[in-house]
C-alpha cells in the first residue's frame, strides 16, 4: 500500500472520554507531531472538556513554528427524535403502573407519532426498570452502543462525530453540546437530528458516522439480534435476505443523516 503524503485524524478520544480514551490532549498532539500527521481532531464523548487543553497547547506549538492543525469536535450521543423518545418514556412509566388510560392519552397527544408509539406499546422490547437502570451513568457503555445483543428504545442512542468548519460552526457546536445536557439528558447528554439540522444551517458543521456505535451500524445490529460482531460480515455475504434487510435500514438512516446536514 502506498504511504499517504498527508494524514489528518478526525476521530480521537483523550482521557476526558472516561473508559474510552487515554492521555491528555497535549500528549495526543505531541504524538501527531512526532509521527508526521498534518492535523488532529479531538472528539471526546458528549462534551468538549478537553478543548482548552488542546487549543492552548496547539497554539503554543504553532507560535514555535509547528505545522499542525487542530480541530475541536465532539462525538455526540444522538437519538433520531427526542420528542418520540419522551413519549416512549412516558408510556413505559404508565405501562409499569398498568395505566392503560394514561398510555392512550399519551398516544392521542402525539398524533403525528401514533404509528411508532403503538409499535412500542405492542412490541416485545425490553421493559426498563426505571428505578434501577442507572440514571446517573455518564460514562461510555459499549455493551449498549456496540452490540447486536442490546436493543431498548428507551436507552437508545447513537454516536455521531460533529466538527466545526468555521468559527461560527464552533460556536454552534458549543451550543449543541450544551443543548444535549439541558434538553436531552437521560443518562447521557443527547441531541437529535432536528437539533443537528438547525445547528448545521449554512454549512458550518461537518458530520461523520463515527464508529460501530453509529446509526448505520445500529441499523445492521438491530436486524441481526444475537450476532457477535465478528460474524456480521460473513453472514451478510452468505445470506442475501439478511443483506437486503440491513441495506434497507441503512438506506433509511443515510437519508435521515443527509437531511439533517
Can you say where each PLM-predicted feature lies in the sequence?
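Phosphodiester-processing cores and adjacent nucleic acid-binding clamps
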Residues: 1-261
Amino acid at each position: 500500500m502506498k504511504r499517504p503524503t498527508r494524514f489528518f485524524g478526525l476521530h480521537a478520544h483523550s482521557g476526558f472520554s472516561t473508559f474510552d480514551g487515554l492521555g491528555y490532549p497535549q500528549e495526543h498532539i505531541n504524538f501527531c507531531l512526532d509521527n508526521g500527521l498534518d492535523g488532529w481532531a479531538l472528539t471526546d464523548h458528549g462534551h468538549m472538556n478537553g478543548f482548552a487543553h488542546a487549543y492552548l497547547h496547539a497554539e503554543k506549538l504553532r507560535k514555535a513554528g509547528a505545522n499542525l492543525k487542530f480541530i475541536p469536535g465532539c462525538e455526540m450521543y444522538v437519538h433520531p427524535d427526542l420528542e418520540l423518545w419522551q413519549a416512549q418514556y412516558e408510556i413505559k412509566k404508565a405501562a409499569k403502573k398498568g395505566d392503560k388510560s394514561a398510555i392512550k392519552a399519551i398516544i392521542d397527544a402525539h398524533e403525528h407519532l401514533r404509528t411508532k408509539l403503538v409499535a412500542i406499546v405492542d412490541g416485545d422490547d425490553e421493559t426498563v426498570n426505571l428505578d434501577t437502570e442507572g440514571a446517573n451513568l455518564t460514562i461510555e457503555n459499549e455493551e449498549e452502543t456496540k452490540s447486536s445483543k442490546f436493543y431498548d428504545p428507551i436507552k437508545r442512542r447513537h454516536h455521531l462525530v460533529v466538527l466545526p468548519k468555521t468559527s461560527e460552526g464552533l460556536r454552534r457546536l458549543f451550543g449543541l453540546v450544551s443543548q444535549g445536557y439541558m434538553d436531552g439528558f437521560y443518562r447521557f447528554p443527547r441531541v437529535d437530528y432536528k437539533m443537528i439540522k438547525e445547528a448545521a444551517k449554512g454549512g458550518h458543521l461537518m458530520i461523520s458516522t463515527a464508529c460501530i456505535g453509529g446509526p448505520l451500524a445500529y441499523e445492521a445490529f438491530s436486524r441481526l439480534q444475537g450476532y457477535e460482531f465478528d460474524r456480521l460480515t460473513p453472514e451478510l455475504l452468505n445470506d442475501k435476505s439478511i443483506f437486503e434487510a440491513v441495506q434497507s435500514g441503512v438506506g433509511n438512516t443515510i437519508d435521515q443523516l443527509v437531511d439533517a446536514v
